[in-house]
A protein has these predicted regions:
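A short coil-to-beta-strand element that immediately follows conserved catalytic motifs
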Residues: 72-81
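Non-heme Fe(II)/2-oxoglutarate
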Residues: 1-73, 173, 180-184
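Residue-level detector of short, conserved catalytic/binding motifs and their immediate flanks
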Residues: 81, 102, 174
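Preference for bulky hydrophobic residues occupying beta-strand positions
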Residues: 6, 83, 106, 178-180
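Catalytic core of non-heme Fe(II) oxygenases with the double-stranded beta-helix
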Residues: 86-155, 182
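Short beta-strand His + acidic residue motifs that chelate non-heme Fe in jelly-roll/DSBH
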Residues: 92-95, 162-169
Length: 184
């Protein structure tokens, strides 16, 4: 079974301010290409780069450490956080976050047709399931898809392969991604 925590975090941060800052950051940051095709992925955001990001990180620290506690792991600390702007047609290919215990994404702006996040279990477990498991569930499925939506927060194991479907709208999808490791 896949382990993905999700919630809608309304009124957590000022998304309008984050959108404004995202486009400003894009103008002043060469960015990087990791899993993004056609989109912008910023360099790492540092503490005090943006007050709304700092507020978000405080919240993420609590959420990730709650998840860590649920699965019997020690306290976690953020290792990096970055901005994604995915215009129409862009997507993120299948990847994982090497070295991260937990990873996640917060949607500053996300709506229908902007590309859902997909998690893939590539262990072949479905071939061991009995033939009578006709209906796919989170237990039996090799892929789980979660909607792209404003204020959506997803936290998952860093080793879990995932991708983001292509943005089929005419509006940019804006998200903040992050990684956590064991606190030193």
């Amino acid at each position: 079974q896949q382990v993905i925590w999700s919630k809608v975090a309304t009124d957590l941060v000022d998304n309008q301010e984050l959108k404004r800052w995202a486009y400003e950051r894009k103008q002043n940051d060469v960015g990087r290409v990791v899993s993004n095709f056609g989109g912008f992925q910023s360099s790492d955001i540092l503490p005090k780069d943006n007050s709304q990001i700092d507020i978000l990180v405080e919240h993420l620290d609590k959420e990730v450490n709650w998840c860590s506690q649920q699965v019997g792991l020690p306290e976690m600390q953020i290792t990096n956080i970055w901005l994604n702007i995915n215009p129409p047609g862009s997507y993120n290919h299948l990847h994982n976050h090497v070295g991260a215990v937990f990873s996640g994404v917060y949607y500053v702006h996300g709506e229908e047709n902007q590309g859902n996040i997909q998690f893939e279990r590539m262990d072949g477990a479905e071939s061991f399931l009995p033939e009578y498991v006709a209906k796919q569930t989170y237990y039996s499925a090799s892929r789980a898809t979660y909607p792209c939506k404003t204020n959506g927060l997803y936290i998952f194991p860093g080793w879990l392969k995932h991708s983001v479907q292509g943005n089929q709208s005419n509006i940019d999808r804006i998200s903040i991604s992050f990684n956590y490791e064991t606190k030193s």
